[in-house]
Amino acid sequence: MAHCRSPFDRFLAMLNVSFRPRSLLAATCLCTIPALSQSQSTTKLTAVERSIASAVDTHNAEALGLLERIVNINSGTLNFAGVRQVGDALRAPLESLGFTTRWVDGAAFHRAGHLVAEHPGPGPKILLIGHLDTVFEPSSPFQRFEKLNDSTARGPGIIDMKGGDVILLYALRALKDAGQLDRMNIVVVFDGDEEESGTPLVAARKALTDAAKGATAALGFEDGAADPRTAVISRRSAGSWDLKTTGFPAHSSQIFKPEVGSGAVYEAARILSEFYTKLSKEPYLTFNPGLVLGGSLVKSDTTGTEGSAAGKRNVVAEHVQVSGDIRTLSPEQQERAKKTMQEIVSHHLPKTSATITFDDGYPPMAPTEGNKRLLAMFDRASRDLGLGTVVAVDPSRAGAADVSFVAGIVPMIIDGIGLSGHDDHSEMETADLRTLPVQTKRAALVLYRLNQGARRSQP
């Protein structure tokens, strides 16, 4: 029986390097991927494509230096000055590549704002998406880039997603060095509030959705599923719901009698039970009641994350509030689920009432045919570079991200092509630095081929 190695082991063995996995996720056994050497496939590249790949290698040390620099800038979402500082660190090199940049002020949605960079050209419009903020505010003890060895580093936001931002930038740099960027029409949006979105959400994502209009393709540089052999072509939504039930307050000895009824708690329990019975088996649909408050008196904050309840064992509960989330794979699935939940809520136990409200939050990104075509291009580019096959991530493992806001606007979308690593959103957030040039080459080559394909198809 063959020894089962981790995704990183198999992937890096393919490139003739070794790596010891540092987390359970990285140690998942995948034993069916055939080995492939770079020398076997790079002959499929044109001279221009080889020059693009070579330019990535030339600037890799510089890219690592920029990564360390911006990781060492605290840019927790609510640290507005830090978010702007990271934006400034990316703004200068973008301008040196010929981009026109502007800062979209975030006062209207209570955040720092966003960096938008535009490079008009004769090619099809392509949107590139990153974000400047992290989950680590200035109060966090996790603040500095730390090189663990030649191939591994730890730091706040190193994979989510400052590494992806650097990959985006140096893919453009490679295209510039190869003499191709001037022929391309690129728009870059670095959101400043991906980790904790501003409100109203429509205002917070207006810069992104405006930039998406007219784009042929969009590439997002999030860190994906901790495996450099995967990319994201579908993401589930991240919405919320709030359920409120009421009952008739009375002595508990009278519960279930016609004049008293069943009480608010039983009504809430009925509804949640029917949600589970009717919807829990549907693929990719999840809904979680994360906070339940019930009793004679209920108080909760506006975020649905905390509250208080008071009641007595011998008093029929008058109020219940339930706050939950809902995740769906497509707009159609989202509407079906909401309709079913509303139908369940509309039927009541005796002497009770109930209402449910929804906040759609982050929309779903369905696995469209266009997204599949773009993944096929990305996979082909990777194989031609000698970097192996790239397959789609199971959407149940792909959380919500800003790229979903351009679904339905842009016909081809791919995400999760940033820096690989593990333990994001924790003080063990760690990157495998060897995937920096790998992902940069893949992205640069796909951008070049998108542009070339459009030029060849013109009459």
Locations of the language-model features?
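Bacterial N-terminal signal peptides
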Residues: S23-P34
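Acidic/histidine-rich catalytic neighborhood of metal-dependent amide-processing enzymes
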Residues: M161-R236, G294-G304, R455-Q458
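Metal-dependent amide/peptide-bond hydrolase catalytic core
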Residues: Q40-A47, S75-G76, D223-G224, I233, ...
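Short beta-strand segments
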Residues: I129-G130, V189-D191, L219-E222, T246, ...
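Acidic/His- and Gly-rich active-site-bordering loop/insert found
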Residues: T43-P156, K176-R183
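Extracytoplasmic/secreted envelope proteins and their assembly/folding machinery
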Residues: L64-E68, G87, R91, L169, ...
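Active-site metal-coordination/substrate-binding segment of hydrolases
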Residues: G123-F190, E196, D210-K213, E427, ...
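Bacterial N-terminal signal peptides that target proteins for export
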Residues: C4, F8-L25
